[in-house]
Amino acid sequence: MSLDVVVVMDPIASIKIAKDTTFAMLLEAQRRGHRLHYVRPGGLSLHEGRAVAQVAPLSVREDKASWFTLGAFTELVFGPGQVVLMRKDPPVDAEFIYDTQVLAVAQRAGAQVVNDPQGLRDYNEKLAALLFPQCCPPTLVSRDAAALKAFVLAHGQAVLKPLDGMGGRSIFRSGTGDPNLNVILETLTDGGRKLTLAQRFIPDITAGDKRILLVDGEPVDYCLARIPQGDEFRGNLAAGGRGEGRPLSERDRWIAAQVGPEMKRRGMRFVGLDVIGDYLTEVNVTSPTCVRELDAQFGLNIAGLLFDAIEAGTAQ
């Protein structure tokens, strides 16, 4: 059955196709004979209770100089036989939330939305990991700079980060004796107005921050370890980390087994777990990445696994 695959993403002209997971999904959908539709940025709306989008027919190809072609934009009304790939990057700001609310109406009209709009609203990527405390390192989330400071001092070293960042932005490592600790906490909490996450520093970060992908609740057999370079402690590829594929360890599979069933139950078809050493640190649900790197290193087709699940869901 041929489907209409509607992609909501950041501007397609600015992506780097060698690393872009959304591009891998589009290639796979096109290979299967599905029709691709690109939503104009800001192009979701509600008309008299119906979810609609300004879309253009899209074709994609493995060409770094010219990787897509768009047709003319028209209005599409969401309904059955459609799959919506919600792939906008964080921050999960008010406009992002509004888009998920439009997509919830699309879902009620019969479109299949990946990932589930309600789940995208419910799961902050930093806080969602704490729903599985058996998997996590010691963590404190607070607006209280004094409480956060006490946590850092109690553990010797900690990582401090905002709840709305991505790609390693505004993440600090601090500890006992750091003269900048107070100002870091003042900045992150915005003087006590913003929740900030403090997590015990995990020395295993030197071996990489592992990205484990879940497809329909099941882990891909390989993860991408994002290894910090030089004197950097952040492994994020966006922060200069080097990606190295590895088979999942027994502990990785245990963590995936703790998280996967709940993600599947909530309609989170494609999820990225961040694991450092033996600990889950984040659950990424908005636009997880690393598919292209893992596909290239191990001859995988992870987007194929996703579309197997999508097509099975559409057939039900």
Swiss-Prot record:
Domain (ATP-grasp): residue spans on this chain: 124-311
The keyword S-adenosyl-L-methionine is annotated on this UniProt entry: no
Catalytic activity field: gamma-L-glutamyl-L-cysteine + glycine + ATP = glutathione + ADP + phosphate + H(+)
Enzyme class: ligase
Binding sites annotated in the UniProt record for ATP: 151-208
SUPFAM superfamilies found in the cross-reference section: Glutathione synthetase ATP-binding domain-like (SSF56059), PreATP-grasp domain (SSF52440)
InterPro entries linked to this entry: ATP-grasp, ATP_grasp_subdomain_1, Glut_synth_pro, GSHS_ATP-bd, GSHS_N, PreATP-grasp_dom_sf
Binding site for Mg(2+): E282, N284
A molecular-function term among this protein's GO annotations: glutathione synthase activity
The keyword Magnesium belongs to this UniProt entry's keyword annotation: yes
Required cofactor names: Mg(2+); Mn(2+)
Pfam families hit by this protein: GSH-S_ATP, GSH-S_N
Keyword terms of this UniProt record: ATP-binding, Glutathione biosynthesis, Ligase, Magnesium, Manganese, Metal-binding, Nucleotide-binding
Cellular component aspect of the GO annotation: cytoplasm
Cofactor comment text: Binds 1 Mg(2+) or Mn(2+) ion per subunit.
PANTHER family: GLUTATHIONE SYNTHETASE, RIBOSOMAL PROTEIN S6 MODIFICATION PROTEIN
UniProt similarity note: Belongs to the prokaryotic GSH synthase family.
Protein name: Glutathione synthetase
Origin species: Xanthomonas campestris pv. campestris (strain ATCC 33913 / DSM 3586 / NCPPB 528 / LMG 568 / P 25)
Gene that specifies this protein: gshB
